[in-house]
From Swiss-Prot:
The keyword Lyase applies. Keywords: Lyase. The gene is FGR4. SUPFAM superfamilies: NTF2-like (SSF54427). Pathway: Secondary metabolite biosynthesis. InterPro entries: NTF2-like_dom_sf, SnoaL-like. This is Probable cyclase FGR4. It comes from the Eukaryota. Probable cyclase; part of the gene cluster that mediates the biosynthesis of the tetraketides fugralins such as linear fugralin A and cyclic fugralin B, volatile compounds that play a role in the asexual reproductive cycle but are not involved in pathogenicity. Pfam families: SnoaL_4. GO terms for molecular function: lyase activity. Its EC number is 4.2.1.-. The keyword Isomerase does not apply. The lineage of its organism: Eukaryota, Fungi, Dikarya, Ascomycota, Pezizomycotina. It comes from Gibberella zeae (strain ATCC MYA-4620 / CBS 123657 / FGSC 9075 / NRRL 31084 / PH-1) (Wheat head blight fungus).
Amino acid sequence: MAVSPEAAAIIQRKKAQYCRFADSNQWDRFDSIMLPSATFLFHNPDGSVITKGDIEYSWSSTKDWVAFFENEFKTMQTIHILGPAEMGQIAPDEIKAIWAVTYHAGTKEHQGGVHGTGGGHYHETWKKVGDDWFMESLRMERLYWKLLSV
């Protein structure tokens, strides 16, 4: 089913805010984009869950996802760049969206440190609550990640 221009505009705006809020460390603002019970899963190209040490990139609430990335990005600067979304309305209150993303992350110091560039696709479900739309689930399928010491 086709997505209404109004619903598409709301979701596109909120996804742009997702990137801006993450890149500018405005973690307290994600509750305006995501349901409290939103789920998050990040995959490698081979389908395995991304890990860092013993931590799996899988969260069952917005609060847990925010807590992880708020801490993770304290010493990092990021920029997320999205392509246009593919959207389909699954039910009157549910829209599926897929976004291409390229992201850069690096330590905040001007010299030395590390820099990484990655890309992939966000697969998301958005739910209508009243007259607004909120992210219910996010699955990131990473296609590329390159980390360099600088």
